[in-house]
């Protein structure tokens, strides 16, 4: 009788030990999974913030190029064709993201560098052009730079336009809209510079989007939902 009772106790203890071990193993697995998930989220957040920072850094770099001409005009300096060409040539970047630099007095493109290959944009009224007017008008009204596109450029290829509004100030301190300093950006080169492909290579899904100034709608520019 004692032997049978001892065997039952052993079986019970073995079964109890099994369930305890199984429970602890499951608990450890859940703990490890949660830690891995937390690390993955932190890594994804860091990667996203790094990418956002890279985009902002690139845009600030391009804006600095545009601001040189902007500040000269705001200071009352009249830029002639030769000076515009010389200064604009210094703005061209090694990565060929900046395809052209334009000045648009009263919103109408009057100066372009380089002119070769960009003749089709000369005389274009940015405040009235169907595909450009929303961002151009927003820049004029807000006093802040806006980016239009990507779309097919007048010159061909796909690009985006950075509108940097220029205002002159009279003796009374009143500001008057002068026009725009415009950078024509090569879209593919811009994407290469901000290295979005690294997100896809790392297995992330992502979307690059903007708010339509005309409708306020969410407009998707790039959407990767199935990374390779």
Question: What are these model-derived regions, one by one?
Answer:
Residues 1-5:
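Short, Lys/Arg-rich, polar N-terminal cytosolic tail immediately upstream
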Residues 7-9, 13, 34-36, 49, ...:
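Residue-identity detector for glutamine
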Residues 10, 14-79:
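Juxtamembrane extracytoplasmic/periplasmic/luminal helical "stalk" adjacent to the first N-terminal
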Residues 41, 45, 75-221, 225:
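Intrinsically disordered, low-complexity polar/acidic regions
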């Amino acid at each position: 009788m004692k032997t049978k009772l001892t065997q039952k106790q052993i079986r019970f203890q073995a079964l109890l030990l099994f369930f305890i071990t199984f429970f602890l193993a499951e608990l450890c697995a859940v703990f490890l999974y949660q830690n891995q998930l937390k690390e993955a989220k932190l890594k994804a957040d860091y990667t996203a913030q790094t990418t956002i920072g890279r985009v902002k850094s690139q845009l600030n770099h391009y804006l600095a190029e545009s601001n040189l001409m902007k500040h000269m005009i705001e200071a009352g300096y009249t830029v002639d064709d030769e000076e515009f060409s010389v200064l604009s040539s210094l703005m061209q970047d090694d990565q060929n993201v900046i395809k052209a630099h334009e000045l648009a007095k009263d919103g109408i493109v009057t100066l372009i560098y380089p002119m070769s290959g960009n003749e089709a944009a000369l005389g274009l009224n940015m405040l009235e052009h169907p595909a450009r007017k929303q961002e151009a008008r927003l820049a004029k009204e807000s006093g802040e730079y806006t980016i239009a596109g990507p779309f097919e450029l007048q010159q061909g290829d796909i690009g985006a336009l950075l509108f940097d509004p220029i205002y002159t100030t009279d003796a009374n301190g009143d500001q008057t809209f002068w026009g725009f300093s415009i950078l024509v950006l090569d879209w593919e080169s811009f994407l290469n510079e901000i290295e979005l492909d690294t997100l896809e290579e790392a297995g992330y899904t992502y979307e690059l989007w903007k708010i339509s100034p005309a409708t306020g709608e969410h407009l998707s520019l790039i959407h990767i939902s199935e990374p390779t």
